[in-house]
């Protein structure tokens, strides 16, 4: 491993010990904000520090095995050769692990997220599929013990949703779900299809990180147009008699957010503002990323939200992830929320791409 990397790891080890000492300091414990920040830093350092300690131990084992191999005793020599192989293999694996742990972290990975699912081409079938996708993500969230809160729905005439927006809260939510942004295509025989023909429909999924209040960009109230209206259910029928639903338009960007799933106008307004902040932040982030990456686009990009990223083929029980050429024949389990079989390879591909970029640099 490069000396510069070893020095960086030694610095992190030193910082970890400093943070640990500070966490037991009475003054820090009394300052809850500082205590929380240091606790978060300690948990972020934990993995890399523990892996580096294992790496140091493996290097010691290697040196010890080398010394034993100089012995005259044939049995000791044989044992030392075996220990040398084990240590060498451990060092190689731990080096790879440390490289990944040292990759630049997306600052939003630990944030909660908003997930927006919209029916595209395919009419009723697209809306039904949007409902299926929402159920899939809900099941996945439950399996991770995350909280899911519906913020706005526009139901389809024959089931599912023309649009559904939800907030998912929990540990590392955005980091897991961010690569779900893009076009999702379904191929299946609709229940109303008497000839048994396969129809193709599509939905768009957008995943945005929640912007913590302390980091939220300031939104000028003069830039907002706020409309109130009655919340409605499927087919447009009104489900309450007060104007509790909220529509907020951000005039400079043209972004429009509606929230109608809460009974009070105050709650709908608060939720609409948090979604609006996330969308405006996403626009700003996209501008910055485009400027930074004008010469190079990430392989597992979630930038082009219209790009088809995945196909769900029901007759074949197949799910195909187009960005990494991965095809799995376990669609039933996938639609029940067992999606780590695609989520994890996407994260790994992104890490490999970042490592390659560092190598090029």
UniProtKB/Swiss-Prot annotation:
User: Residues annotated as region Disordered?
Assistant: 286-305
Principal location class: cytoplasm
Alphabetical UniProt keywords: Cytoplasm, Methylation, Protein biosynthesis
Task: Provide the protein's localization.
Answer: Cytoplasm
Q: Which GO terms describe its cellular component?
A: cytoplasm
Q: From the Swiss-Prot or TrEMBL record, what is one GO molecular function term? A: translation release factor activity, codon specific
What residue spans carry the Basic and acidic residues bias annotation? Answer: 286-296
Q: Does the keyword Protein biosynthesis apply?
A: yes
PTM comment: Methylated by PrmC. Methylation increases the termination efficiency of RF1.
Query: Where on the tree of life does the source sit, at the highest rank?
Result: Bacteria
- Residues bearing the modification N5-methylglutamine: 237
What is the recorded function of this protein according to its Swiss-Prot or TrEMBL entry?
Peptide chain release factor 1 directs the termination of translation in response to the peptide chain termination codons UAG and UAA.
Return the HAMAP family for the record.
Rel_fac_1
Q: Which family does it belong to?
A: Belongs to the prokaryotic/mitochondrial release factor family.
- Protein name, per record: Peptide chain release factor 1
What organism is the protein native to? Answer: Shewanella pealeana (strain ATCC 700345 / ANG-SQ1)
Gene of origin? Answer: prfA
